[in-house]
Amino acid sequence: MSESPLVLPRRLAIRILHAAQTAQPGSIRGVVTARAGQPSGLRVGSDTPVADETVWAALWSCPQAEAVPSAGELVPGQLSLVVSLNTKGVLEMRAWQRQGDTASERVLQIRD
């Protein structure tokens, strides 16, 4: 049985990609927060959501590498979003979860 796609609101995806792009040549780390189980916010430089939020995904960028983490970079049971700025003119965001000793990619859809 396949997992259902993850859905990220377009405005939030744009905020994430913008934060990664403006941090160049540095990287970003933070979390995507959720309200009522749905991704709703971005906290760059922090892994602590506010009172009515939960962590939906860990987030980091790789300015000079692909958006492909090793299993060791992933926390078991936690979704991770990785942004790559490695390809000139193209920003890439991919979702990952650790499955045993491997990094398993999840389908990520951006919707209005």
Predicted segments, located by residue:
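Conserved beta-strand-loop surface patch within small alpha/beta domains used
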Residues: 1-56, 65-112
